[in-house]
C-alpha cells in the first residue's frame, strides 16, 4: 500500500517555488535524472560491474564488448570478446549477437557460460572458444530449468510440463486439458520462498514438479496497465474465507517415463512449500503449512512410491509460521541438514538429523540470518549473510542498519564476520565454488559502491575491483536522517527515514509527503547508499518538501 499525502497540492506548488533562490549555485535534478526510465537516469546510478559473478574461483564481468576475468592474486584480463563469441557461433551455424548477452554459469567446475539468443540456448566454453551445446527453443516455452547433472532442460508450454534432451528431443511429462490446471509452474502466489515449479534430483534421474488445480478459485479482475489500452486479465486469487487452489507434487522418472504422485493427503487446501531432494534421490522433503498459516510440518516422502515416510517435526505459532527456505543437507554428511526458522523471533540456523532430531542451534541473537551463501570445499564451514552488527562497532543488537557476511564452523558452532563496517552499511557477497573467496559489493549512506575480492577465511581484502564515485557530486542534496520510533506495543522498534528539504529553515513549516509501503519483506529503510532513498524523494526535497 502506498500513501502519498497532498499530492495535488504538491504538484501545483512546484511551480511556485524558485529553485535557484533555494539552492544558490548548486545544480538541480530533473525528473529524467532521477526516475527509472528517464533519459539521463543512468548517469546518477553508482557505477557497477556488469554481470559480475564467479565461474569456479575465477570472477567474470562484462566491460563493453569484452568479458573480463580475474583471480584473487592475478591481474584482470580479457577472457573473450563478442567477436570471438560470434566466431564460435558461426562454426555451429548460429546467428551472431549484436551485443554481449546475459550469461549464467551452468557448471561450478567448468569454464562454460550459458546464454539464450535467437531461440536457442548455448553453452560456450570460453577457454576453448567453442559452443559445446546448443538447444533449440520455442518462443512459447517458459520456466526453463536446466539440470547440470544430465544436461536436460525442463520447461512449460502453456500449462503443461515438458523436457528437452541435449539432442533436442522433447518428452511430454504432463498432458492436462482441463481449464484451471497448471503443471511445472510456481504455486501458492509465490509465497513461502516459492519461485519455481520444477525440482531436479541431484543426479538428474528424476524431476519433481507442482501440479495446481485452481479451477475452483474465483477470478479476480486484474487489469494490465502496461498495454497501450488497459485490458482485463483475470487471475485466480483465493480470497479469505473462499475456496483455495489444490496443489500436489509429481515425480517424473526419466528412465521409465512414468510419474509417481506424493500422497500428501487431506486437507487438500494446504501449502506445499520448500521442496528438497535427499542426496540419495530416494526421498523428498516438503514443508507443509496449513491454510491458517500457523502450523507447519516438515514431512519426508518416498520419491519411489509417493508414500509418506515420516513427519519430522512441527512448528506452531499463534500468529503465523512462514517457512521460507528448504532443508539444506551438509555436503559431507547426508544424514544431517540445516533448517532456517524464526521460532525464537529471529531467523536463525538449526542443525537437524534425518530422524527429525535437533542437534544444535547454530546461530542466535537479536538479529536475522538473511541468506546462506554456501559451504567451503571441505564442507566444514558455512557462509551466511545477516543483520548481525559488525564486531568493529560499539552498539547493541537491533540498533543498526547493517548487513554483513560471516563464516560458521559447523562442528564448533562458532562464527565470525568476514566483512566489516560501521553502524550502517550493506555487504552483498557471492561465494566462489571452493569457498576460498568472496565478491563483496559494499555500500553505505555515504559510500556509493565498493567492490572487492575478500579472503574466505579471514577479514582481508585481496583486491579492489571498483570504487564508484559519487554520482550526485555538484548537486544540491537534501539531508537524510534515520532513526527509530516505537510501534503501538511501546516496545518494538520501527525504522524511519526523513528527507529534509534542501536549505531547511527550522523556523518554517514545510509541505510534507508521507510514504509508506506496509507489505511483508519490504524494508525500505536500509543502510546502503543514501539509506535507500529514491530519486523522486530527492527531487521533491530539492523543491522544498519534507519526505
Residue ranges and their predicted role:
Residues 1, 236, 285, 336, ...:
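Generic hydrophobic alpha-helical membrane-segment signal
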Residues 2, 18, 30, 80-84, ...:
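Short, solvent-exposed coil/turn linker segments
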